């Protein structure tokens, strides 16, 4: 039903002109917006709901200031419509759409709505309003979570089709998750939240096929294929596709580490690094190998381990062509070509190309090795054979004894 038309301006009972008011006085008729029947028919359901809420809120503000006056016919109409638009009510236009539309048509309609500039007024509902068995949740009750049935039936590529948009929700209309109890203002937000419980990823990238549980995550991912990097670091000039990635990168320059471990106090610059570090204390190994069943705490460790089964060596040396399973192994190998030795011994200062060689070399500095360290009369006086009570030398001692010699 269309709202009432704009009332005629009140007239002075003693004269022929309009009623006199104090300068600066404002009435509801001065700020209200009225639509004729034809204009009202052009509005979408969400726009109509927004109009009703704004008019009711405006009249409430004027009444609080004591200038509301008698209740206008428009407000009486809004209150009558509010009863019809309860949480269980359905838009008449939505009721006409009982069959699922083609996903391509839905995407075209969505683009058309964005061109009309109504994106800020509407919130898409990823579940078709006419889907059988779909009801708006009223109060928590036993049974499967809201939207669970529809999620299993949703198409695997693209966003589930839309028939029409629901009205803009009010503050008292909250949609609760029956799994964890969280509540949301938008029903579509609740449905996307339920995907986190089911593990379903219905939003697929048309370029690479990767799936996402949220439409916003897919939108951010698409920027990678478009090559967009709008967020640039002012320190080094490096650009990123997402603002959050730039924020994390800036901590490299500032040295900020806001995430601290409650068990050992170690601090990290990213929350994901802290989350993975916590597995060191909990002993959690959630990433098992599908071939041998061995579990790992980090997905990167699992990927490296899987290469021992497949024999894959994806990191070739550009100098000699030798391939390695890990990039760190290839980087250490390249030092044999460049002669770089970045790891010094803290006791004698001798430098090595690999950190493991430093650890093996430090065995000669062990306490109680016997003999006077240093060169005497042109020869090495340190005893290279283990003494009584010494720990066994590392394996590399027999293979590479030259790395255990001390510098004079």
From Swiss-Prot:
Residues 91-167 are annotated as: Disordered. A zinc finger (C2H2-type) spans 175-197, 203-225, 231-253, 259-281, 287-309, 315-337, 343-365. Its main location: nucleus. GO terms for cellular component: nucleus. It is found in: Nucleus. Pfam families: KRAB, zf-C2H2. Residues 26-97 form the KRAB domain. SMART domains: KRAB, ZnF_C2H2. The keyword Cytoplasm does not apply. It comes from the Eukaryota. The KRAB domain and the zinc finger domain are both necessary for the regulation of NR3C1/GR transcriptional activity. Interacts (via KRAB domain) with NR3C1/GR (via NR LBD domain); the interaction regulates transcription factor activity of NR3C1 by directing its actions toward certain biologic pathways. Zinc finger protein that functions as a cofactor for steroid hormone receptors, such as NR3C1/GR. Directs NR3C1/GR transcriptional activity toward specific biologic pathways by changing NR3C1/GR binding and transcriptional activity on the glucocorticoid-responsive genes. Belongs to the krueppel C2H2-type zinc-finger protein family. This is Zinc finger protein 764. It comes from Homo sapiens. The lineage of its organism: Eukaryota, Metazoa, Chordata, Craniata, Vertebrata. The gene is ZNF764.
